[in-house]
UniProtKB/Swiss-Prot annotation:
Cysteine-cysteine disulfides: none
Free-text cofactor note: Binds 2 Zn(2+) ions per subunit.
NCBIfam families: PRK09357.1-2 (NF006837), pyrC_multi (TIGR00857)
Catalyzed chemical reaction(s): (S)-dihydroorotate + H2O = N-carbamoyl-L-aspartate + H(+)
A GO CC term assigned to this protein in UniProt: cytoplasm
Domain of life: Bacteria
Organism: Lactobacillus acidophilus (strain ATCC 700396 / NCK56 / N2 / NCFM)
Lineage, uppermost ranks: Bacteria, Bacillati, Bacillota, Bacilli, Lactobacillales
Protein name as it appears in the record: Dihydroorotase
Record-annotated active site: D301
Pathway participation: Pyrimidine metabolism; UMP biosynthesis via de novo pathway; (S)-dihydroorotate from bicarbonate: step 3/3
Length: 425
């Protein structure tokens, strides 16, 4: 059967064009005008984009399915326009053997409604210094390695991990955090931490580990990816490293460019995340880093929790906020439509082709004939309100609920199949 998406504004090869998209046999066949098919979707006034790519999500299965599971997490991704995601390995048990990795990959395929690529751990349970068999994990389906949620605390362990990752052509994606400097902190060091009388988080907890790892990456030649950079100094370190030819990429999370610690209204668990919200100077540096190419891509760090784990003050709350369902609309509304900091083409690139390119996901993030028909359609002309009742995720832990936005997802397709359509259950 031939399906045509008609009359849309199509993002292709870095440009926006007025075109139709013809889909057949799960693939994009033609992008052109005056196309016809057996089934047609009218996308007049809508944005037709490649399915977005999010290389940083937490789906909590197995082990904590009361927070999220593969099905609900992937449904949330689809509702946000994401068709390809990278799932972090901080589940129970951690997929640190080929048997566990194979089981995880199979579960992702059976339960997920989007393409789910699975990370393996850098170290066995993400906190020890024991390095698993990377070759076996890769053979079993691991596409990259991460201890996200934990920094690798010893330089020797990271050095060995990088050597082994390089030998197996695997990316090391790190949560840069020196625990001795993090020191059970909650809010970014500064006025807000003092005002709320909460333990501060120094930027050094992030930046010292990035500096260490960049030297190790230079020595080993590994592809070193930094998750959720959040400080001005982090951006400066990456900029210098790229100038020296170090094989480094990095991501920024939407909340770190949309919000600062000044936006925390009170001691509210919904604003507790790791890294924490930083100051305005850091926020400005992150935006400059995106615009000049120092920061390669945007990734949500979708981290769902049960309501009871985020209610009340920050001290007792879990770290993390959701992001899959709010990322595109909040970023588009603030930075493209209102403040005009980015172009729409730039935003789409950071959410589609750039992450796919960074992680070598060859079929993802582009609209081209012959590629998988992974497509997201957004309504960028009409305002909508982000409402808790609409979330597909089990987690509702986001400060963006109630915001009025443009860019709501109308439809998401994976391999030509509609996996989300606005207004349907």
């Amino acid at each position: 059967m031939k399906t045509v998406i008609k009359n849309g504004t199509v993002y292709q090869n870095g440009r926006l064009i007025h075109a139709d998209v013809l889909i057949e046999d799960q693939k994009i066949k033609v992008i052109g005008t005056n196309l016809t098919g057996d089934k047609e979707f009218d996308a007049t006034g809508k944005l037709v984009a490649p399915g977005l790519v999010d290389v940083h999500v937490h789906y909590r299965e197995p082990g904590q399915t009361y927070k999220e599971d593969i099905r609900t997490g992937s449904e949330a991704a689809a509702r946000g326009g994401f068709t390809t995601v990278g799932a972090m390995p901080n589940v129970t048990p951690v997929p640190n053997t080929p048997e566990l990795m194979e089981k995880m990959v199979k579960k992702n395929q059976e339960k997920g409604i989007v393409h789910i690529f699975q990370y393996g751990p850098i170290t066995n349970d993400e906190t020890t210094d024991i390095i698993p068999d990377y070759a076996a994990l890769k053979k079993a389906g691991a596409f990259a390695l991460s201890n996200d949620g934990h920094g690798v605390q010893t330089a020797q362990t990271m050095y060995l991990a990088m050597q082994k990752a390089k030998a197996n052509n695997l990316i090391i994606a790190t949560h840069a955090q020196d625990d001795s400097l993090f020191n059970h902190g909650i809010v970014n060091e500064g006025k807000k931490a003092e005002e709320l009388n909460l333990p501060p988080v120094t930027e050094l907890a992030e930046t010292t580990q990035i500096a260490r790892d960049l030297l190790l990456a230079q020595k080993t030649g590994v592809h070193y990816h930094i998750c959720h950079v959040s400080t001005k100094t982090s951006v400066e370190l990456v900029r210098m490293a790229k100038a020296r030819g170090i094989n480094v990429t990095c991501e920024v999370a939407p909340h770190h460019i949309l919000l600062t610690d000044d936006d925390i209204p009170k001691d509210n668990g919904y604003y507790k995340m790791n890294p924490p919200l930083r100051n305005k100077e850091d926020q400005a540096a992150l935006l400059v880093g995106l615009l000049d190419g120092t920061i390669d891509l945007i990734a949500t760090d979708h981290a769902p929790h049960a309501k009871k784990e985020k209610q009340g003050g920050m001290k007792g709350a879990a770290f993390g906020i959701t992001g899959s369902e709010t990322a595109f609309s909040t970023l588009y509304t603030k930075f493209v439509k209102k403040d005009k900091v980015f172009t729409l083409e730039q935003l789409l690139s950071w959410l589609s082709d750039k992450p796919a390119e960074a992680f070598g996901l060859k079929d993802a993030g582009v609209l081209e004939p012959g590629k998988n028909a992974d497509i997201a359609i957004f309504d960028i002309e009409h305002e909508a309100t982000i409402e808790e009742k609409d979330y597909k995720s089990k987690g509702v832990n986001t400060p963006f609920t109630g915001q009025k936005v443009y860019g709501e997802t109308v439809m998401t397709m994976v391999n030509g199949k509609v996996v989300y359509q606005r207004g349907t259950k």
